[in-house]
Amino acid sequence: MTDIQTSMPAWEQTRSLLCQYEPEFYELEPGGSLALHLGGEGWLLEITPDGRLICQMGMDMSDIQSLLSDGTPEDLGTDELAKQAKYYLQPAVAKARHALVKAGFEENTEMTDQYVAVTFQRPVDFRNLDEVKQAIGWCRGQFN
């Protein structure tokens, strides 16, 4: 049996209990990660089936294209759009960075053709649900 197969029942149970604990959680895809909006600046909390707690903020590439083109047909490359997206994200990320890193989160940047996101993630142990709930509450407190 693979690790994924053995962890799926634990995830299914954890997912169900977390949705009871925090009814605002929603699935990003059926049976997959749970997500929760954090505050008004666009932060998102995500809990993944493989045991990661992620706080992230991102921008859709089409949104940044619209901001930069201001109605002109100028076509910017993906790299330039990604640089500009990170520039727009920096003020909000800078406010949260110290607290998240101090709490054991690792910072990363994810980029695709569709979006750019700054993520802060740390592992959580589904066997200790109280600790997972505490971590969720702490994250909510940082952004509300």
List where the protein language model places each region.
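Residue-level detector of solvent-exposed, low-hydrophobicity positions
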Residues: 18, 32, 50, 95-96, ...
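Short, internal acidic amphipathic alpha-helical interface segments
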Residues: 60-119
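Well-ordered, non-membrane alpha-helical segments in soluble/globular domains
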Residues: 86-96, 132-143
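Residues that cap or initiate secondary-structure elements
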Residues: 42, 61-65, 124-126
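A short, solvent-exposed beta-edge/loop patch
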Residues: 103-129, 133-142
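Negatively charged, low-complexity tracts enriched in Asp/Glu with abundant Ser/Thr
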Residues: 2-31, 68-80, 129-142
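Charge-rich, low-complexity N-terminal segments
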Residues: 1-59, 87, 97, 101-104, ...
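Short, surface-exposed, charge-dense and proline/glycine-enriched linear segments
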Residues: 53-66, 137-144
